Amino acid sequence: MSKKALLIIPPERFNEDELFQPKEVLENTGVAVTVASTKTGEITGDYLGKALAEVIFSEVSASDYDAVAVIGGSGTNDHLWGNQELQSFLKQAHEQKVLVSGICAGSVTVAKTGLLSGRKAACYPVDVQIDELKANSVEYAKQHVVAHDDIITGDGPDGAKEFGESLAAALR
């Protein structure tokens, strides 16, 4: 049975590299990828790239997936950081032994759940994100990917392919 990953993007302004590079890596290793958001339909990225959100994350069961990833982009700060429904979804996924991950601003979204408290994480190297990690008792690590057994975080576009490879390796 093939592995399944749910990639969650904001309803606008996702980062194209952070979605498309990991998605391609996962699909090339046989992982079935579903793109989710807070709405379905076509979503425009930070650089006008287009993605199709097939499902609303809150309408699917985390346990149907082997991995859940929160993708970054300027819309992630605005729409996903404070989304209580998403935080509950990620905590539930973690409880059900689903691999939880985030890249760039998505790492901060994961940190806000408390799941990374006392641990290291990667995020985009800007103060607003690093400060949010610290505010959630997470130690910032200046590297492309930080992989724990249960949670993986990535820094952003430069580490997007490596983030995808880390997810794929964890799902093998």
Per-region residue spans from a language model:
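Glycine/proline-rich loop-helix segments at beta-alpha junctions forming the active-site rim
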Residues: Y124-V126
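Extended, subdomain-level signal for the structured scaffold at the beginning of enzyme domains
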Residues: M1-V100, T109-S117, I130-R172
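Catalytic nucleophile serine of serine hydrolases
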Residues: C104
